[in-house]
UniProtKB/Swiss-Prot annotation:
Listed GO CC annotations: glutamyl-tRNA(Gln) amidotransferase complex
Name recorded for this polypeptide: Glutamyl-tRNA(Gln) amidotransferase subunit A
Active site (record annotation): K74, S149, S173
Organism in which the protein naturally occurs: Synechococcus sp. (strain WH7803)
EC number: 6.3.5.7
SUPFAM superfamilies: Amidase signature (AS) enzymes
HAMAP family, per database record: GatA
Source organism, top-level taxon: Bacteria
């Protein structure tokens, strides 16, 4: 059921928040040995949160919009009093003394914290295999990855361990795992949701967003999380519209642009292409006009991203030196040796690789050739999107070139791993909102996602189109097999 339906049942007393929470905690206990979506399950807190909701309802109080709704939070969002590790040995014992703006707003809306979810270390990866605490399995097939970096959050929703979850998206880290796990994943406009309390990877690209079973649930969560925040100077001071009100509007007469560069990709799986084109035809059947558009520099996005993102990561991760907090190497001969050893032992290989790439790109002899040039190309990519939106309302592409790949398939080939974000990265570079919605399955039964991209702050239109497609296509009648439940 959708969040709105659960809210109604909770308000009517048909189900209690405690019962809903206990159901999901039991589900977590049953399937976690096979999925490993969670790094920490906060069962005691969840039950206490739920009991407070039930007490408020019993006393006749008006319940906030997410009262009693069990959520999971990606473990790179600070939660006061609950460990926030970023799936790294560097922060294995870090307990934040403050709350992120996102989680603060969710708790104020009555949401229940079930726990913190697994991710690629410091959100750097596309499979959740770089986590220092072990990989997460794809609920549709445990021999395949759930995507990344927010693989734990996606898998938790897909396997029914929570009603919805929160992730972060720097180059596709919400949309790609949403596609791989057969759930909805929304990356809002850059600055639409505060990043205060989000552990930084690449500050000009990072954005928080929801995973859910439906577009309507994504709209509900966005409604709570969006809005200005004086603690984040990049957060937009723009009015927050009623996102749910847009869902029922028809798509008739809207222009949907098919980005030709995306459908001409050499590595695009034919099954993915066919499924996504069928999704476009579904929108056409609903009255939308399909228009072929070109974004000539779309394919330059991945090279641009892998200069800018590692450069920002190199600067952001310089703070982890073993002095004030985080992992500290023992018995070092000097401060310099302690810092060097702490970083070498605390960071995994993928994080170290990206720090080195970024440090190189920012070095005195190469900053003009790499970093500044990448920023110039980023501007050109944004201009391509601006030109496209002169003639269409939303853009449509595959979310990923293929379906979820096998565990370990790209372990020795980081470039192949990076290519899984080929189709999602440009929206991050341009700061645009984008959503992945399930649109079908491959012959192996793995989900396929279609990506819709909107113009800046056009989340209402994006959600409108996504919801209308979702309702018409109804591809997600099935859920992952309960293969991990004992007995």
């Amino acid at each position: 059921m959708a969040i709105a339906e659960w809210r109604q049942q909770l308000a009517n007393g048909e189900v209690s928040a405690r019962e809903l929470t206990d159901h999901h905690l039991a589900r977590i206990e049953a399937v976690e040995p096979g999925i490993h979506a969670f790094l920490e399950v906060t069962a005691e807190r969840a039950r206490a949160d739920a009991d407070r909701v039930d007490e408020a309802r019993a006393s006749g109080e008006d319940l906030p919009p997410l009262a009693g709704i069990p959520l999971a939070i990606k473990d790179n969002l600070c939660t006061r009093g609950v460990r926030t590790t970023c799936s790294s040995r560097m922060l294995e014992q870090f307990v934040p003394p403050y709350e992120s703006t996102v989680t603060e707003r969710l708790w104020a809306a009555g949401a229940v914290l079930l726990g913190k979810t697994n991710l690629d270390e410091f959100a750097m990866g596309g499979s959740t295999e770089t986590s220092a605490f072990g990989p997460t399995a794809n609920p549709w097939n445990p021999e395949h990855v759930p995507g990344g970096s927010s693989g734990g959050s996606a898998a938790a929703v897909a396997s029914g361990e929570c009603l919805a979850s929160i992730g972060s998206d720097t180059g596709g880290s919400i949309r790609q795992p949403a596609s791989f796990c057969g759930v909805v994943g929304l990356k809002p406009t850059y600055g639409r949701i505060s990043r205060y309390g989000l552990v930084a990877f690449a500050s000009s690209l990072d954005q928080v967003g929801p995973f859910s079973h439906s577009v309507a649930d994504a709209a509900e969560l966005l409604q709570v999380m969006a809005g200005a925040d004086p603690r984040d100077s990049t957060c937009l001071n723009a009015p927050v519209p009623d996102y749910c009100a847009a869902l029922g509007r028809p798509v008739e007469g809207l222009k949907v642009g098919l980005v030709k560069e995306c459908f001409e990709q050499e590595g695009l799986d034919p099954q993915v292409k066919a499924s996504v084109l069928a999704a476009a035809q579904q929108l056409q059947a609903l009255g939308a006009d399909l228009v072929d558009v070109s974004c000539p520099r779309f394919n330059d996005g991945i090279a641009t991203y892998y200069v800018i993102a590692p450069s920002e990561a190199s600067a952001n991760l310089a703070r982890y030196d073993g002095v004030k907090y985080g992992y500290r190497a023992e018995d070092a001969a000097s401060l310099a040796a302690m810092t060097a050893r702490s970083r070498a032992e605390g960071f995994g290989s993928e994080v170290q690789r990206r720090i080195l790439i970024g440090t190189y790109a920012l070095s005195a002899g190469y900053v003009d050739a790499y970093y500044k040039k990448a920023q110039q190309v980023r501007t050109l990519i944004r201009r391509d999107f601006d030109a496209a939106f002169q003639s269409v309302d939303v853009l449509l592409t595959p979310t990923a070139p293929g379906t979820a790949f096998r565990n370990g398939a790209h372990a020795d080939d980081p470039l192949a791993m990076y290519l899984s974000d080929l189709l999602t990265i440009p929206a991050n570079l341009a700061g645009l909102p984008a959503i992945s919605v399930p649109c079908g399955f491959d012959t192996g039964g793995l989900p396929i996602g279609v990506q819709l991209i909107g113009n800046v702050l056009e989340e209402p239109l994006l959600l409108q189109v996504a919801h209308q497609f979702e309702q018409a296509a109804d591809v997600m009648k099935t859920r992952p097999e309960a293969a991990f439940i004992p007995g």
